[in-house]
Amino acid sequence: MSFYDYSANSNDGKPKKLSAFKGKVLLVVNTASQCGFTPQYKGLQDLYAKYKDRGFAVLGFPCDQFGHQEPGSDDEIATFCETNYGVDFPLFSKIEVNGDNAHPVYKFLKSEKGGLLGDAIKWNFTKFLVDKQGNVVERYAPMTTPERIAGDIEKELER
């Protein structure tokens, strides 16, 4: 199995096969609009703008499991991201990343790259770098800023 074998609902509620991103380097992030890390949206958008023409995308998966910091509807989330951070990278419908109802995409990501203290996602803005073949190559903690990931993205784009 690879990342591209899964699907998820895009922010408009329509199913989207992740195979649509095959051949791209991806940064997959669980996001929230009312979190101390929310300003990372700017850095994520900057990475997307810088590298999208080279085969890179950021995929945002809003999640309300951590401190109820993503209470809005999918439409409200999209409006917030666009208005405040100019986000135009793909956003998906709100999901759960941990527990019995964790989305299959996140079950896969966590099984491929566990964290320091087990597989569970600990907070918003945990990031996974996925290579062009759909393999999870790195997992980053929430406090790792998008700017610090640029070098790893460059390496994957050059492979």
What are these regions (language model features)?
Residues 1-19, 104:
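N-terminal "domain-start" segment that seeds a small globular fold
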Residues 7, 75-123:
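Short, internal strand/loop/helix patches
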Residues 10, 30-34:
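Amphipathic alpha-helical repeat scaffolds
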Residues 10-13, 85, 147:
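Preference for well-ordered, secondary-structure-rich cores of eukaryotic proteins
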Residues 55-73, 88-99:
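Thiol-based oxidoreductase modules, predominantly thioredoxin-like and allied folds used
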